[in-house]
A protein has these predicted regions:
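C-terminal catalytic subdomain
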Residues: 360-460
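Active-site proximal loops enriched in glycine and acidic residues that flank catalytic Cys/His/Asp
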Residues: 76, 153, 335-336, 389-392
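N-terminal export signals
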Residues: 2-26, 31-55
Length: 520
């Protein structure tokens, strides 16, 4: 059977035969309980005897760690030309003296305060360094630890830019037209920095999209993209039952290559013991029951399955929180979620993943590392839950997206109405049918199997139907031609988030070698 044969003898539903990867770093029962290798045991110790210490069953529910702030180093480059008789002694630019530079530094500080107040992502601005000579970069406060340089290129030599690039720093190149004294490099950034006195761009890790003129909003979305990327690269994710890929066994390997993901495996035998330990803990069970009761009292919530399935889903949620605390991460995915986990947990993982996402974790079904990296990246950029889903076939500007694990706080705050039902394909357990809001603009990512091309599509939710498919269902309307979308669709699973983050995704992906094909 070929790698991409999905006919019925290959279990043709949204989760076909799993291709669990044994290449990812695994957590054996012993190492899991004692601490993950490579991390200090004292900070990672997780023994099942003191379950309440780890699982938070003293009433304090575990919460995910926050995103790491993007550290931004502002650097002002300028020159102080000296007047000379009967010759051209000064270049373009409104900053010509030390007094001009001091005033510009004060202006930059005001702008950084504006950016900080506007940012919906964690960012730390380091002290401004103003230089006339590349040698002044040596020992500049915070430069070595900075993730990104915000270069205010008022004037001065081009060597500063090259020096920053040689250090491997992402550089946002800011020049002024009318937002302050005009910049010299507003004139010559293209022919000198980008094209190196030629007709074609010569820079490899810096292009036209890295240059901003005047607009702080343009700086802000670039910083948002870089914050999301920094929180994605080398991040850790727990894979229950191993890492896999929808019809593509190399997906975990490719995810590691592109995003340096640290995939930690928890085997199903180990999970079975964790569930057994949690069920034996009366406080853990009581907390799960209390949470189930509170969840069902949320406005717009109706129960259409057995209450016990919801309580078991909450207990599984608490176990997964403890697993992620042990692994010191905020991301988890489940392999064989449409079979193996059901008799073990006596529910489905659908509602569990939904509640985890609502509380700020990144929780995905199917352990499909074709699409999981896109969810991690989009969530880290937007700071909101995302919805892994199955697409259908586009027609007349419309496509249906569906799955059984939809978050209820897709905007990060508002709890949307939901019917708590069974998982569709098993008619078992607890799964939310979230009524995602009509009129909402969504960013949709279509990752390719080869991890070299992702397609982007904006859509508007026009309906939340109730078809005989996965419970969470949305019809989205899009602007591009339906046939063109059908011809350009790669991979299988999509990732969807509220809002338009198409620019941020393209800006981030070019840094990891993935083509962003945005269809509008």
């Amino acid at each position: 059977m070929s790698e991409h044969d999905h006919t019925p003898h290959c279990h043709a539903h949204c989760c076909p035969h799993a291709h669990a990867s044994e290449e990812g770093a695994g957590i054996s029962r012993r190492s899991f309980l004692g601490g993950i290798s490579g991390v200090a045991v004292g900070s990672m110790a997780f023994a099942w005897a003191p379950w309440t210490d780890v699982a938070g069953t003293d009433g304090a529910l575990l919460v995910p760690p926050a995103r790491r702030p993007l550290r931004v180093k502002p650097v002002l480059t300028y020159a102080t030309p000296q007047r000379a008789p009967k010759t051209s002694w000064r270049p373009w630019g409104g900053i010509q003296t030390e007094e001009d530079a001091k005033a510009e530094t004060a202006r930059i500080l005001e702008e950084l305060n504006t950016l900080r107040a506007s940012a919906d992502f964690p960012v730390e601005f380091l002290p401004v360094t103003a230089i006339r000579d590349p040698k002044q970069l040596e020992g500049a406060a915070g430069l070595a630890d900075a993730d990104t340089v915000l270069l205010y290129a008022a004037g001065g030599p081009s060597h500063v830019f090259q020096q920053l690039r040689d250090q491997g720093k992402d550089v946002i190149y800011f020049v002024r037209h009318k937002s302050g004294p005009v910049s010299l490099w507003y004139e010559i950034v293209s022919p000198i920095q980008l094209r190196g006195h030629s007709d074609e761009r010569v820079t490899k890790n810096f292009d036209e999209q890295d240059v901003v003129v005047d607009n702080l909003g343009e700086v802000l979305w670039r910083l948002r993209a870089l914050c999301g990327l920094r929180n994605t690269m080398s991040s850790r994710i727990v894979a229950i039952g191993g890492a896999s890929g929808w019809a593509h066994p190399r997906a975990p390997e490719l995810a590691k290559e592109r995003f340096k993901l640290d995939i930690q495996t928890v085997s199903y035998p180990d999970l079975a013991e964790m569930i057994k330990a949690a069920r034996a803990d009366q406080a853990a069970v009581a907390l799960a029951q209390e949470r189930a009761e509170a969840y069902l009292k949320l406005p717009g919530t109706t129960l259409e399955t057995d209450l016990k399935f919801v309580e078991n889903a909450m207990l599984l949620d608490q176990i997964f929180r403890a697993v992620m605390k042990q692994a010191d991460c905020r991301a988890i995915t489940i392999n064989e979620c449409m079979g193996t986990i059901m008799p073990m947990s006596e529910t489905t993982a659908c509602l569990t993943l939904s509640t985890l996402n609502d509380d700020g974790y990144m929780a995905f079904c199917e352990s499909d590392f074709v699409v999981v990296p896109s969810g991690i990246l989009l969530s880290n950029i937007a700071g909101r839950p995302v919805f892994l889903n199955d697409p259908t076939y586009p027609h007349e500007g419309l496509i249906t997206l569906a799955h059984c694990t939809g978050p209820r706080k897709m905007d990060g705050q508002t709890v949307e109405p939901a019917r708590i039902m069974t998982h569709f394909e098993s008619d078992y357990g607890a799964a939310p049918k979230v009524e995602m809001r009509k009129g909402q603009i969504t960013t949709n990512i279509l990752p390719g199997f080869k991890a070299d091309r992702w397609v982007g599509l904006l859509g508007e939710i026009v309906d939340s139907p109730f078809l005989a498919i996965c419970r969470d269902q949305i019809d989205i309307r899009f602007k591009c031609d339906s046939l063109h979308l059908a011809q350009r669709m790669p991979g299988f699973h999509w990732m969807t988030g509220y809002g338009d983050y198409s620019k941020e995704l393209g800006y981030a992906l070019k840094r990891v070698g993935i083509q962003w094909e945005f269809l509008g």
